[in-house]
Design a protein with these regions (language model features):
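Generic structural signal for well-ordered, non-membrane alpha-helical segments
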Residues: 5, 24, 54-58, 62-65, ...
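HTH-adjacent hinge/linker in prokaryotic transcriptional regulators
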Residues: 3-80
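A short, charged, Gly/Pro-tolerant segment at domain boundaries
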Residues: 220-242
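Glycine-rich phosphate-binding loops that contact phosphosugars or nucleotide phosphates
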Residues: 89-217
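Short, charged beta->alpha transition segments
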Residues: 56, 79-84, 128-132
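Glycine-rich beta-alpha loop segments
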Residues: 74-92
Length: 242
């Protein structure tokens, strides 16, 4: 960087410290987080390493998913996630917010929470976010899912829920996300991809870990529900039979 700026490394370090960073490494980390927050679909495609044809692209895609999962495994504070999961059975109501592509994650989490008998609702549009967060209280949990800069409806939903005293949990991919600043807790999962779309391999893995932890807090109840589901899976009319 010093060479590109036409100065010496010591001057760069002084400038970085003047900006409030302890050192150059922290400044580099901030720039990396900034690049994640403001990345676009075109950026991810253009930054991807050139691959050997379509088959090479497929291999690279799987490799990136593996890296995202490995990063989640290496950085996730499992005790903090377990403590967070305990709150779900204590909550009066759980609102899971996620718009656009993140709507599939919100509905995925809602489905499993309802399966466990919890009072959960997915808010996947601007209107539902407004109406569901308008009535939350300190007895409720709001899970907000959005990546990069964060979608406006989701961010404003957290602002509304926080004002009303709800416990807010953010799932995003960078600490520079406004969700991270607004929420009581933040869990990170990378969505890096070599294609035009985001990869949700790591976010789904994070949700699976959270769902599993919630179930473990009341294991006898979870086991009873699992047995009921198993019976329906064996004999239920909604399953196709030859």
């Amino acid at each position: 960087m010093a060479e590109r700026l036409g100065t010496d490394p010591a001057t760069v370090v002084r400038i970085v410290r003047g900006l409030g960073f302890p050192g150059f490494r922290e400044f580099q980390h901030y720039l990396h987080e900034l690049s994640l927050a403001f990345a676009t679909s075109a950026d991810t495609m253009q930054s991807a390493a050139p691959s050997a044809g379509v088959s090479g692209h497929v291999a690279d895609s799987l490799e990136l998913d593996f890296k995202n999962l490995q990063a989640l495994k290496n950085t996730l504070d499992t005790k903090r996630l377990a403590d967070s999961a305990k709150r779900f059975y204590e909550a009066r109501r759980i609102v899971v917010m996620g718009s656009d592509l993140a709507a599939v994650l919100a509905e995925y989490l809602e489905y499993h929470l309802v399966l466990l008998g919890l009072n959960a609702f997915a808010a996947t549009s601007g209107g539902k976010i407004v109406h569901l967060t308008r009535n939350v209280t300190a007895k409720d949990i709001v899970v907000a899912i959005s990546f990069r800069r964060g979608l406006r409806h989701t961010v404003e939903g957290v602002q509304s829920a926080r004002r009303r005293g709800a416990h807010c949990i953010a799932i995003t991919d960078t600490l520079l996300s406004p969700l991270a600043r607004l929420s009581h807790e933040t869990f990170l999962a990378g969505i890096g991809s070599n294609s035009f779309g985001a990869s949700y391999a790591a976010p789904v893995a994070l949700l699976n870990a959270l769902i599993g932890a919630i179930g473990q807090h009341r294991q006898p109840l979870t086991l009873r529900i699992a047995k009921e589901i198993s019976e329906e899976q064996r004999r239920g009319s909604r399953w196709y039979q030859e």
